[in-house]
Structure formats: structure tokens, C-alpha cells
């Protein structure tokens, strides 16, 4: 606005303008805050009148000095005009301040002639202020608006003048963005994102004129230059000598700022410098992808560049601050970064210490220790937790006043806000009651300074006019104080809001505080009505059937009347419980309803830090108690528990959500002092971290720094050290968008994040990134330079020194197994006795030597207990009638085989006579199961000379020195697994046995959904391109959702120690009804310390048990040598199929580990000749980079056999030793290859010097992972036994296969015949080939393959029978299979079992009888009808009608 300096208002403005341009008015370190300004820029399509924009975005706020220098610079150029504009309703104060926004502008107009017309060209440098003493952080833009793009060259010339002025002003880094309007065919409207006025946007790096921000790229652009960071690479190989395509995903971290760049290349060397995390600049042609219709950039030129300055965020201060509050991805739905990212950030800024304070968990401790050690950092171990008093107040200041004699004042207040120190009471209403009779009412309004906020009027319907007729604050507060005195107060949420608000107001006006009792009806409702989902006054009235008008809600007089009805009802209820006075009311309800009160009560967010090594066990116990005994909808740390362990910790409140800061806003000074005295030191945060209070709770912005100062002043007066923390949930300011996405995601149990406003569908996120030292000093400079430095730098370093004085190690590293007396002796005795029972006495030297070596390694290294426990478990399972399946790498151990925990004999191939124990090594085969059964050459016993031994070195299981902790997997029947778990607990005791805990995190598909949901909530779906969603998805993956448990892992802790010396414990998914507790740390963190048993439940052992039961054949007696069975793995000939039924060359369908399409292809190509070859196929199929482009190519190109390629890790060691290499060298090469670690030149040369073939060496160099031979042998043994039943007992085999292995069925489809099943199979195979098949369809595909094979073998499958079907299993009946009830669509086990139970009681007499005695539904009846299963009932009903 133009102002007249002769008017009074004009004079004030002019005086203010002079103040602003004076030099050195502001302190040099004073920083400035800003409102956000959202601008719409319209680019017209008229060429002559086109708008041209040059924008300069500054990286830091402008001080008065800089404004003055710029002003002088413009004047030096050609003269300039200084303007200051105010809003019309600006309010001025004596100190010259204003509550309105102020715009400071330096303006220079030029006139140039174009197209024969004079056009105005304006330079405008402007900044919006919220207060004369505070200048803005954002929107520092130098704008040049002109009428035509012909001005381009002239503007470039002017750029030099701009640069001169900016240098004069002290800026060294800045640039320009040139935006031209698009072609005239379309009118383009450039929209800025709509954001809340409170939503602080991070400042973006300045782009020079050559680069276009990615989110502004559109189809009208042709060739552009951009820059960004690579966050994903996808390489697509070209075929038939065509070029390869590399999709490079880049982002500049602005919302919508991700793009796929396509690079076509032939030579792989050209892409060597293109790596994830690299910043690049590129010249690209903009076009739409023909398939996805997404904008993409076709690369013409690309090169790496340095990370732009803004994104480097260096910490240049000599003395660094220490960040004390940081939340990682392990804070459920509340952290964005991994601890690795955090440590790298710290290391790059030369920080020495990092702290982690995740919420309600310390999962990160083991990783934090390892990462800190890797980066050379010290670690501070913290826990953010919910602190709560043991006693939940229902009554404040309770005494023995009898309920029947008390005078109650039921009251309510309406206020301008939630914060007693910064808001005011505007209405009071109360009803005084004695002996159940109303004796007096009071209601009045109170005046306030300034206008009544519109939001308050909207909620309460109270108007400014009503307040103007009200009482002055002092008088009104004194009046209500006097009226309340001597009475028992009653208020809803009175203990948390009404009472502290009034007490704070009394303190403000020097009025004596209230000391009389107050009953909080909110807490009373929690205790009396545990079934209520909500305890708002309106909801309680609705539940109790009291009239309540929501339109009149939030008026003190109306709320009070409603509350009186509620309180009268509650009083009757407690009197019926025998409660007669206030003290009883408070004490007895706490005792009777303690858990319900804990569930609902508001908690204090505290932070506990470990200060010594002994503190870990104390913290682990404290957290365990919170996660188990005191887990009331969230883990709670009770005051009594904290006091018990307090000496081991350093304790404080969270700087933002803790009671200290809340007290500074809402409570009297006395309560603030009490909160501060309770902690060891005080944490505060920078103002940006408190934005939640201004956004969610309507707190005035100026209250934040005032409250911070109050906390600091009070703490220092009480001699408490004060430090500043970011209270960070992500590292960089631009990661705010990821945090918003997780804030918008609904958490477990349907809970919304505290920063998400569900009603408005809006996230309201504070600026909670990790500040560098300079950033934090700037933001805290309102405290003054010296005090800010003390709190930000000096005190954080003091605390860090205290908290890292010890060399803290959160997890133990030495194996500490449980103790069973005599376990080592029993193991040795069992091993020797069993060996002699099998191989005779004396033992063959080979066997005796192997046992001695193994037992020495096992017992000397403390592993005997592991073997013995496993032996006891398997023995118990076998005694209970359940076969235990083959078990992993343990098969490398002969001791394990002899004591019964492994069926894999690792000796060299050999013969053994079952009659005379004659032992003979055979070197003609490489697997003992490939030795034909013979008559014994010594005693002549018929068919007693049988082969065994799979030639597996012990070193592959327990290391060359035998000191590697054995990982024993026990595959029990899924029907027996729970009993096996219970047996372990019985052996060692509940306090020493826990399920291995796991952490369930956000998976890729879930992260994708969260990202899409975020863009929908902010109504910016046009920005949700595939690469942008990919960027968000990558950041959201891995965030903790909840905890879980390993499917079979049982952790056994030493019975002479406490579990808390190793880990906290909890319940899976915080389910306190769970039968098992879990370890808080995952197995990987405890694997070198605590014994873990993998007691897995699998369908294969279950299937074998039932096959044995059906056929009366013991699976362990199945022949080891069977050429027909071997052939069935790769040929259908042994199955004697009907022709033209099945387009499948192998007989492996349905055989575990061999039935997949991938393995069947390997079988088809390799045609294994025996058991040893089947082990190789298993190794090839389970390894990584072992078959495709490796063994497959070698077999094809060099005409070799399976025994000539590397299939399992043991092959390497055995072959290299065979070639003459030292065993230790062979072992070390095997270890590197099986882990995918590249061999060095020396190791390759060593192999070459020992005559190892080049194709064999090349194969080693390609391998990423190799399967252990013992594991492969175990898989093959299980497959072999099941395959034997398939060949010789087909009906029983298919009954068990369909019952236990196939998850999806189409019995009607089977009945429809071969053509139908073939058609369905072809449809699903097509989906499989194009990778569009869904999980359920994939299951059906396997089922249809089995159906066709059954048909080809002449096996019939009949529909469900009401008289013969089982609930869940396919059963044999009259030479065919009968389907179970569970195959009916939509029928679960409970309903199916109800039919069996009812049928076992007596036959069904009618349809009504069938419905009445089972749990079937209308839909089930419809399904039964369609399958004609109810026809017999209709016949029965018709016969009844005849008679």
C-alpha cells in the first residue's frame, strides 16, 4: 500500500521503515522465523504478453544488515524504492511491534522497448515478516517479471548486476531459475502444493538456469537438463545383439521430484560410474513411455557431480553438539532411518557419539553396538518409555468425607485454549448439590484481552459480545474460587485439565490455590465402565441413555447439567459397591480396577539412559516388566519399578512430549518444579520440534520460546543441567515427506498416529530432523549466544561423557549354554555304545578316529549339551509315535547320526553287513546309497550287505577347528511341534525357555500402499508417479510394525543365570494372552551366546507318519537302492501313465523339493543316475548362481556329468583335497565360495597349480551361495521315502498329498474330466509364464497337475459324502478317494469338524436335523445343494410326507 507520511498512521509506518533499514539494530546471531506463503503463478499463452520469471531462492534468512546492503546495491545501480506494506487490520504496540504480517520490499522498475511498445520490467526483492524483529526463513525470492521472452538476453546481462549485489550482501552461493511459458497451444497453470499454513517446507537447493526441477518437467518440454540423486537402478539386457537398457531412478527430493532416465548402452564399462547414491547431472529428451505412459528422460548425456551444498549439510563448528534423542526405524510407525544411516551421517560430520532412544523397545542395541564400532563412534543407549504412577488418581486430595454428606460442585469451564499459562477462562458453570438435591447454580462469562479466536467460537458457540458483558478475569476467578471452596469438586477430565488450568490461572492472578478434593468422572468411568470404547461425556450419556445434544456440547452450563446426571448415576454405582467416602473411592477402585485405569490413563514420556555396564541387566528387567506384567494396551513403566532400578540409569523426560514441557504450558510453577526435580537432567528441543502444540492444540507460536525459557530458567534455579536435543524421527529436513507418509498410515489395531488428524484427514508434522551444531545454535539463539552454546554444545558433551564413561557392550559374546548334569558323559557313552552296536567292537579305525575327533571338538567347545538336548527331543518324539524328519547341516556329524538326531551318515561310502557287522569301504561310488544290496561276502547272509555313507566332512558343519556353534534344525511333524516345544520348557523351566523373537517390519507391498495412501490424503495423486512411489517405498520398507516369534526357534538360557543378563523379554505382537514369551532381541544378536533349538513343524514328517499308518510300512525301512525309483524322478515310465493325459516328462510332481517347475527342468536335463546325483540336483536348485549360466552351461558345452560340476559346498573341499591341496586351504576356499566372497589371485593360482580345471575355477568365481551337502542329503532322503510311496502305494500317497501338501482344491473341476483340468492348467500356466499368477492360483496350478497325474494313473476322486468324508483329509474308500468337507468353498475347520462330531453321535435324520446339529450356514447349504449332497434328505422327507 502507498502511505501518506503526513498522517499519524503513515508516520508510524515511516518510523518503522527507518528502524528496519538501520544497520546493526538486530543482534548478529538472532534468527528469524516465518509464515509460509503459497503463491499461484499463471503463465499466459500469449507470446507478446508472456510472463518471464527469474527466481533466486536464498539458503538462509536475511538480517537487517543484508537488507541494508541490498538496498544500497540497488541504489548504486540506478536508484530503488523501499516499501513496507501492512495488512489493513494491523495492530501497533508501543514497542513498534505488530501482530500482522509485514512485507518488506525493494523495488526497481525499468522500461524497455519491444515490439514497438514500452514494457515495464520490475526487479522485486521482498520478504514477509511475522514480527519486525523476526525475518523469514523461506520464500527469499528475487523476482524479475517481464512481458516477453525476448528479454532473455537482456536479463542475462542484468544477472551480472544481481551477482554483484548479492556478493556485496555477503552471499556466495546462489543461482537462477529461468522458466519459459510452454508453446501457445495450451494454457499452463503452474500450481503450488496446497499445504497447511503451519506446515514448514524445507528449503530446496538453488538450481542454476541450466537445470529444471524434476517435479516441474512436463510433456511440452523437449530437451532439458536436470540433476538428482540415483536411488534405484534396473538393468534390462538386450537380446539378439540389441542394446541394453539401464533405467536410472533419480530424485531431487522435492515432492513429485522423481523420474526414470533411460540409458541405452552396449559396453558395460560405460555404466561403471552410475551407482545408487551418486548425484548426477543429465541432458535428457522428455517423452512418454509407450507402455506405462509415464514421463521419462532419454539420456543424451550424463555425468556424476558433487552432492549439492544444501544436501551435504556439513557441521563446520569446531566443537560439535551431541544428539541425545533419536528414533530409528525400530520405533514402530515412528522412525524413518536405520541406525546405519544415522551413524554414517554422524561420521561424515566428525561427530564422536550417537544416541538412540527408540520408543518402547531396544531392539536396536546389538546393531547399534556393531555399527558404532564399525564407524569408530561411541554409543549412548537410551529407551523412550511410558512412565506412569502406580496409583491412578480418581480423587485428588481424598479424605474421609462421606459421599452422602458431601457438598458437591459439579462444574465445567470453557477456555480460549488448552494451556493454562497462555490461555484464559471464558465461561464457568457449576451446580452445587448436597444430599442429592441441587442447592445452587452459577454461570458467568469472563472477559479476555484481545479478540476471541474464531476457532473457539466455532467449538463453543460463545461470541465476542457475550465476553464483553462478562466479568474481568481477576474478579471472575476470585468468584469461582470462593464458590468452589470447601466443596467436593466434580469435573470430567478435571484432574488433567480443569483443575490444573484453574490452579495456573490462580497463580497468574495471585489467588490462593484450591486444596479441596476433586472427583474426576473420566477416571471414574474408566473404572466403572471398562466395556466403553470411548469415555467422552457425550458417549457416556449415550451409553447410559441420557439425553445429550451434541450441538450444545462445549458449553459449560450444558455440559455441567449432563455431567450431573452422569455423576448421580456413578455415585449410586459406587455406593452399591460398599464405597462410602472419598478415600475409599480413590483407593478401592484403584485396587479393583487397576488394569483398566492403567489402560486409559495419560502417561508421561520419559527417557532412560544406561550409564554403566551393570545397567543393561537392570534396563532389560525393567523393560521386560513393562512388556509383560504391565502391558496395558502399551508397555508401562510404573514409578515403583523405575525407583527400584533408578540408580543404574540417567533419567529425564522427552523434551517435547514429556511432563516437564507440558507443565510449562499448562500447570502452576510448583508442579513444573516438581517435574524437574524428578529427573536427573532436563532436555529441551528447538522451537520447530514443538510445532505439534501450535498445529494440534492451537498454542500461540510465541508461547513456545517463552515456555522453553521458563523451563531453562526453572531448571537452572534448581541446579539441574539443561541440554538441547532435536527429538529427531528422521535425519534430514527433506525426509519430512517420508515421515508424513508413515504418519498417514493406520497403525496396528486401527490406531492413528498422534500427528494425524483423522477427522480432517490431515497430517500435522513438526520439524523433527537431526540438527547440525550450527543449525541448532541458530534455532536456539533466542536464548542468547552464550546460553545457547552452553545448552547446545557444552552440556550435551558433558552428558555424552557421563553416558559413555564405560565401554558399554549390550549383548554378551561367549556361548553360555544351559546345564544338564552328566550331559557330556551321557553323550560320549551313547555315541560309543551305538557305534559299537552298529559297526561292532572293536570299531573300524576310520570310524573310531572320526568319533574321537568329533567328540573332542563338541565337548571341549561346550557344545555337548546342544547335542544331548536334541537327542532327548528326538527320542521323545519317536516314543510318541512321530517320525522326526531330516535335519540340515547336522548331517555332517557322525556323532549326531549315532545318537539319532540325524539320519545322514557322513562317512565315506561303505558296505555294512546287518548280520555280522562286516565293514567295507567302497570307492566305486560317491554315495553309499548307490551301492547295490548284496549278500555278505564274509558271512553269506542274504541281501544283508547294504550301502551307506554320503561322504560329508565334519568341518563343513562346525568349522575346520570344530569351534563353530552348531545350528541344529529339528523338523518335527506339524502335528507334534507344539508338544516338542512344551517338552523343552518342561526340561529347562519356563523362566529359562523363550521363543526366539522376531521383528515384523513394513514389507514392500505394504510400503507401496502407504506411499499411495499419502498422496491420496494430501490430494496430490498427480505427483504419485511410479518412480516417486518407488522412492517413498524404499524409505518406508523396514519400519517396525510389531514383534513376532520364530516359527520353531526356542532359546534356552543358562539355568544358573537370569535371562535379563542377556535380553529383555516380551510377548509376540504384545499379545499378553500368548502361551510363550519371546526374546526381545532377535536370534542373530544372541546366536553366539544362547542355545537356540530350531524345533520346526513341517508337513513332510506328518505325511510320512500317515503314509506309514495307511500302508503299515515303516518309512525308515524303505530300500535305499532302487533303480526304478531313481528313474521316476526324471521319467514317467515307472508310473505307467495312460497316454496323452499329462504333458510332463518327469515323475517328480508332488515330491517335496523336486516337484517345482524349476527343479523338474533340472531333472529333465540331468537325468540323475542315483542317490548321489539327486543330492547334487538338490544342491544345484538351492544354491545361487550355481545352475543357470554355470553348471547348466558346463554340462551342455563340455558334455560332462553331474559329478563333474560344483553342486554343494562340500564338493569344493573334497575335490580340492582330492587334487592334492592341503585340507586347510581347501576349507578356506570352500568357505569363501559358498558365501559368494571373491577369490583372490593367489587362491586361483593355488587351484591352477594343483591341476584344477579352468571351467571348475570359473564356476567358483560365479557362485554367490552354496547349499550344504548334509542339508541336500536330508532333503533327498525325505523326498526318496515319499517318492517310494508314490510309486508303490499310489492311492495312499495321493490321499496324503492332497490332505497335507496341497492348499487349494477344485474337486468339481476334477469331476469335470481331463479336458476341463487341462484347460484350467493351460490358463494358469500362461499366467505363470507372464508372471501374473496370484498365490492362490499358483497353488491351484500344482493341484491341477496332480489331478491330471492321478487321472493318468487311473485314480478316481469322488465328491464329498455325508457319510464317509473326513473334516480335513482325503480318505480311501472302495479303491477311490473321497474329498473332505473343508474343500467346500468358504467352509472352515470348525464347521467341518462340527459335521463329523454330529455324525459320530448319530446319523442325520433330516435336513432340519443336519442344520440344527452342525454349524453350517445358508451359503454352505447352497453349496451342498449344488453338489446334490442333500438329495437323500429330500427323499427321506418325501417318504415321511407319504406316511
Swiss-Prot record:
Q: Could you state a single Gene Ontology molecular function term?
A: DNA binding
Q: Which UniProt keywords apply?
A: Cytoplasm, DNA replication, DNA-directed DNA polymerase, Exonuclease, Hydrolase, Nuclease, Nucleotidyltransferase, Transferase
Name the InterPro entries for this protein. DNA_pol3_alpha_NTPase_dom, DNA_pol3_finger, DnaE2/DnaE/PolC, DNAPol_HHH, DnaQ, Exonuclease_RNaseT/DNA_pol3, NA-bd_OB-fold, PHP_dom
Q: Where is this protein found?
A: Cytoplasm
Q: Where are the transmembrane segments?
A: none
UniProt superkingdom: Bacteria
**Residue ranges of every copy of the Exonuclease domain listed in the record:** 408-567
Pfam short name (any one): HHH_6
Would you tell me the Gene Ontology cellular component terms?
cytoplasm
| Family of the protein in this entry | Belongs to the DNA polymerase type-C family. PolC subfamily.
Q: This protein is called what?
A: DNA polymerase III PolC-type
Organism (species): Mycoplasma pneumoniae (strain ATCC 29342 / M129 / Subtype 1)
Name the lineage. Answer: Bacteria, Bacillati, Mycoplasmatota, Mycoplasmoidales, Mycoplasmoidaceae
Amino acid at each position: 500500500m502507498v502511505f501518506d507520511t503526513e498522517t499519524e498512521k503513515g508516520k508510524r509506518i515511516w518510523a518503522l521503515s527507518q528502524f528496519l533499514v538501520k544497520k546493526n539494530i538486530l543482534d548478529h546471531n538472532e534468527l528469524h522465523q516465518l509464515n509460509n506463503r503459497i503463491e499461484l503463478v499463471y503463465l499466459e499463452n500469449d507470446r507478446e504478453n508472456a510472463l518471464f520469471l527469474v527466481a533466486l531462492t536464498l539458503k538462509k534468512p536475511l538480517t537487517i544488515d543484508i537488507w541494508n546492503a541490498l538496498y544500497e546495491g540497488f541504489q548504486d545501480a540506478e536508484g530503488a524504492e523501499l516499501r513496507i506494506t501492512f495488512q489493513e487490520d494491523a495492530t501497533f504496540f508501543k514497542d513498534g511491534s505488530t501482530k500482522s504480517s509485514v512485507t518488506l520490499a525493494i523495488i526497481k522498475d525499468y522500461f524497455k522497448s519491444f515490439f514497438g511498445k514500452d514494457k515495464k520490467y520490475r526487479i522485486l526483492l521482498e520478504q514477509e515478516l511475522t514480527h519486525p524483529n523476526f525475518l523469514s526463513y523461506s520464500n527469499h525470492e528475487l523476482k524479475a517479471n517481464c512481458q516477453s521472452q525476448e528479454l532473455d538476453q537482456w536479463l542475462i546481462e542484468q544477472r551480472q548486476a544481481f551477482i554483484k549485489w548479492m556478493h556485496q550482501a555477503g552471499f556466495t552461493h546462489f543461482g537462477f531459475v529461468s522458466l519459459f511459458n510452454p508453446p501457445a497451444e495450451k494454457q499452463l497453470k503452474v500450481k503450488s502444493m496446497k499445504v497447511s499454513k503451519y506446515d514448514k517446507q524445507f528449503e530446496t537447493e538453488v538450481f542454476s538456469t541450466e537445470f529444471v526441477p524434476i517435479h516441474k518437467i512436463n510433456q511440452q518440454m523437449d530437451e532439458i537438463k536436470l540433476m538428482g540423486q540415483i536411488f534405484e537402478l534396473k538393468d534390462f539386457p538386450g537380446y539378439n545383439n540389441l542394446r541394453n537398457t539401464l533405467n536410472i531412478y533419480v530424485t531431487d527430493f522435492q515432492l513429485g521430484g522423481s523420474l526414470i532416465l533411460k540409458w541405452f548402452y552396449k559396453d558395460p564399462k560405460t555404466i561403471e560410474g552410475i551407482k545408487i547414491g551418486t548425484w548426477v547431472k543429465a541432458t535428457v529428451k522428455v517423452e512418454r513411455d509407450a507402455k506405462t505412459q509415464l514421463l521419462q528422460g532419454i539420456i543424451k548425456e550424463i555425468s556424476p557431480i558433487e552432492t549439492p551444498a544444501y544436501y551435504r549439510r556439513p557441521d563446520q563448528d569446531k566443537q560439535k553438539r551431541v544428539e541425545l534423542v533419536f528414533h530409528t526405524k525400530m520405533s514402530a510407525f515412528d522412525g524413518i532411518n536405520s541406525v546405519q544411516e544415522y551413524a554414517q551421517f554422524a561420521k561424515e560430520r566428525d561427530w564422536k557419539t550417537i544416541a538412540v532412544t527408540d520408543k518402547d523397545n531396544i531392539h536396536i542395541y546389538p546393531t547399534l553396538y556393531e555399527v558404532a564400532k564399525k564407524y569408530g563412534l561411541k554409543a549412548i543407549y537410551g529407551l523412550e518409555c511410558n512412565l506412569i504412577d502406580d496409583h491412578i488418581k480418581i480423587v485428588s486430595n481424598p479424605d474421609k468425607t462421606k459421599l452422602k454428606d458431601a457438598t458437591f460442585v459439579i462444574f465445567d469451564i470453557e477456555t480460549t485454549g488448552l494451556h493454562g499459562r497462555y490461555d484464559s477462562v471464558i465461561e464457568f458453570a457449576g451446580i452445587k448439590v448436597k444430599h442429592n438435591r441441587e442447592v445452587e447454580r452459577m454461570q458467568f462469562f469472563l472477559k479476555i484481552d484481545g479478540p476471541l479466536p474464531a476457532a473457539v467460537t466455532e467449538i463453543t458457540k460463545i461470541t465476542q459480545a457475550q465476553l464483553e458483558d462478562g466479568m474481568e478475569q481477576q474478579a471472575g476467578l476470585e468468584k469461582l474460587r470462593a464458590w468452589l471452596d470447601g466443596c467436593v469438586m466434580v469435573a470430567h477430565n478435571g484432574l488433567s485439565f480443569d483443575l490444573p488450568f484453574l490452579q495456573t490461572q490462580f497463580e497468574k492472578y495471585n489467588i490462593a490455590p484450591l486444596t479441596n478434593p476433586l472427583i474426576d468422572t473420566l477416571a471414574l468411568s474408566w473404572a466403572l465402565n471398562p466395556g466403553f470404547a470411548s469415555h467422552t461425556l457425550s458417549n457416556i450419556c449415550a451409553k447410559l441413555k441420557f439425553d445429550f445434544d451434541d450441538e450444545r456440547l462445549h458449553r459449560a452450563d450444558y455440559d455441567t447439567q449432563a455431567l450431573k446426571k452422569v455423576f448421580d448415576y456413578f455415585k449410586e454405582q459406587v455406593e452399591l459397591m460398599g464405597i462410602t467416602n472419598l478415600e475409599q473411592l480413590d483407593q478401592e477402585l484403584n485396587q479393583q480396577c487397576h488394569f483398566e485405569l492403567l489402560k486409559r490413563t495419560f502417561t508421561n514420556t520419559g527417557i532412560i539412559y544406561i550409564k554403566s555396564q551393570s545397567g543393561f541387566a537392570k534396563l532389560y528387567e525393567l523393560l521386560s516388566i513393562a512388556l509383560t506384567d504391565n502391558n496395558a494396551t502399551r508397555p508401562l513403566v510404573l514409578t515403583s519399578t523405575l525407583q527400584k532400578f533408578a540408580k543404574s540409569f540417567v533419567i529425564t523426560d522427552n523434551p517435547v512430549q514429556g511432563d516437564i514441557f507440558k507443565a510449562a504450558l499448562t500447570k502452576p510453577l510448583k508442579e513444573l518444579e516438581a517435574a524437574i526435580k524428578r529427573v536427573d537432567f532436563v532436555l529441551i528441543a528447538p522451537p520447530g520440534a514443538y510445532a505439534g502444540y501450535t498445529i494440534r492444540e492451537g498454542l500461540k507460536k510465541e508461547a513456545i520460546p517463552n515456555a522453553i525459557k521458563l523451563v531453562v530458567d526453572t531448571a537452572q534455579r534448581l541446579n539441574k543441567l539443561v541440554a538441547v536435543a532435536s527429538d529427531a524421527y528422521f535425519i534430514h529436513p527433506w525426509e519430512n515427506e517420508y515421515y508424513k507418509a508413515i504418519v498417514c498410515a493406520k497403525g496396528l489395531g486401527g490406531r492413528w498416529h498422534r500427528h494425524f488428524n483423522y477427522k480432517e484427514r490431515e497430517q500435522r508434522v513438526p520439524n523433527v530432523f537431526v540438527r547440525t551444531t550450527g543449525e541448532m545454535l541458530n534455532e536456539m539463539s533466542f536464548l542468547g549466544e552464550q546460553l545457547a552454546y552452553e545448552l547446545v554444545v557444552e552440556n550435551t558433551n558433558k552428558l555424552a561423557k557421563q553416558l559413555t564413561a564405560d565401554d558399554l557392550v549390550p549383548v554378551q559374546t561367549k556361548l553360555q549354554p544351559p546345564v544338564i548334569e552328566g550331559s557330556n558323559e551321557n553323550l560320549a557313552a551313547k555315541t560309543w555304545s551305538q557305534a559299537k552296536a552298529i559297526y561292532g567292537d572293536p570299531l573300524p579305525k576310520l570310524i573310531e578316529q572320526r568319533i574321537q575327533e568329533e567328540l573332542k571338538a563338541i565337548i571341549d567347545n561346550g557344545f555337548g549339551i546342544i547335542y544331548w538336548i536334541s537327542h532327548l527331543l528326538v527320542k521323545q518324539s519317536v516314543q510318541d509315535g512321530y517320525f522326526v524328519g531330516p535335519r540340515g547341516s547336522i548331517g555332517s556329524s557322525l556323532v549326531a547320526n549315532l545318537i539319532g538326531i540325524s539320519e545322514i551318515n557322513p562317512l565315506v561310502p561303505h558296505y555294512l553287513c546287518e548280520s555280522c557287522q562286516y565293514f567295507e569301504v567302497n570307492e566305486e561310488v560317491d554315495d553309499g546309497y548307490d551301492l547295490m544290496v548284496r549278500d555278505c561276502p564274509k558271512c553269506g547272509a542274504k541281501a544283508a550287505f547294504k550301502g551307506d555313507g554320503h561322504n560329508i566332512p565334519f568341518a563343513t558343519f562346525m568349522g575346520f577347528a570344530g569351534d563353530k556353534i552348531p545350528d541344529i534344525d529339528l523338523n518335527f511333524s506339524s502335528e507334534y511341534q507344539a508338544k516338542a516345544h512344551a517338552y523343552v520348557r518342561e526340561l529347562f523351566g519356563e523362566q529359562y525357555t523363550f521363543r526366539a523373537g522376531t521383528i515384523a517390519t513394513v514389507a514392500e507391498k505394504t510400503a507401496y500402499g502407504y506411499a499411495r495412501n499419502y498422496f491420496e490424503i494430501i490430494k496430490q495423486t498427480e505427483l504419485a508417479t511410479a518412480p516417486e512411489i518407488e522412492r517413498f517405498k524404499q524409505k518406508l520398507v523396514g519400519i517396525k510394525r510389531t514383534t513376532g516369534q520364530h516359527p520353531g526357534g526356542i532359546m534356552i538360557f543358562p539355568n544358573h543365570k537370569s535371562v535379563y543378563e542377556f535380553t529383555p523379554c516380551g510377548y509376540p505382537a504384545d499379545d499378553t494372552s500368548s502361551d510363550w514369551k519371546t526374546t526381545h532381541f532377535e536370534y542373530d544378536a544372541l546366536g553366539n551366546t544362547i542355545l537356540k533349538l530350531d524345533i520346526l513343524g513341517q508337513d513332510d514328517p506328518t505325511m510320512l507318519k500317515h503314509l506309514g499308518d495307511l500302508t503299515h510300512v515303516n518309512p525308515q525301512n524303505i530300500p535305499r537302492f532302487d533303480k526304478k525309483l531313481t528313474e521316476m524322478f526324471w521319467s514317467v515310465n515307472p508310473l505307467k501313465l495312460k497316454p496323452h493325459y499329462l504333458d510332463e516328462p518327469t515323475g517328480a510332481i508332488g515330491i517335496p523339493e523336486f516337484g517345482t517347475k524349476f527343479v523338474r527342468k533340472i531333472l529333465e536335463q540331468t537325468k540323475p543316475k542315483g542317490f548321489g546325483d539327486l543330492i547334487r540336483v538338490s544342491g544345484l536348485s538351492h544354491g545361487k548362481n550355481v545352475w543357470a549360466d554355470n553348471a547348466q552351461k558346463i554340462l551342455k558345452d563340455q558334455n560332462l556329468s553331474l559329478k563333474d560340476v560344483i553342486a554343494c559346498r562340500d564338493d569344493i573341499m573334497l575335490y580340492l583335497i582330492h587334487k592334492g591341496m592341503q585340507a586347510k586351504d581347501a576349507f578356506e576356499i570352500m568357505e569363501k565360495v559358498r558365501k559368494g566372497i571373491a577369490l583372490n589371485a593367489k587362491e586361483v593360482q593355488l587351484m591352477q597349480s594343483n591341476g584344477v580345471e579352468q571351467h571348475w575355477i570359473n564356476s567358483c568365481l560365479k557362485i554367490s551361495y552354496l547349499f550344504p551337502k548334509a542339508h541336500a542329503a536330508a532333503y533327498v532322503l525325505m523326498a526318496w521315502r515319499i517318492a517310494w510311496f508314490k510309486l508303490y502305494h499310489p492311492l495312499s500317497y495321493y490321499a496324503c498329498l492332497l490332505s497335507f501338501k496341497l492348499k487349494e482344491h477344485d474337486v468339481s473341476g476334477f469331476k469335470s474330466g481331463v479336458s476341463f483340468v487341462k484347460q484350467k492348467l493351460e490358463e494358469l500356466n500362461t499366467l505363470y509364464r507372464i508372471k501374473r499368477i496370484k498365490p492362490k492360483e499358483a497353488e491351484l496350478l500344482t493341484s491341477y497337475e496332480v489331478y491330471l497325474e492321478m487321472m493318468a494313473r487311473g485314480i478316481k476322486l469322488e465328491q464329498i459324502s455325508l457319510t464317509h468324508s473326513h473334516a480335513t483329509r482325503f480318505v480311501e474308500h472302495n479303491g477311490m478317494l473321497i474329498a473332505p468337507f473343508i474343500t467346500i468353498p468358504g467352509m472352515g475347520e470348525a464347521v467341518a469338524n462340527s459335521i463329523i462330531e454330529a455324525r459320530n453321535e448319530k446319523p442325520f435324520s433330516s435336513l432340519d436335523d443336519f442344520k440344527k446339529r452342525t454349524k453350517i450356514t445358508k451359503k454352505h447349504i447352497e453349496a451342498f445343494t449344488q453338489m446334490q449332497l442333500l438329495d437323500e434328505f429330500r427323499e427321506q422327507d418325501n417318504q415321511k410326507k407319504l406316511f
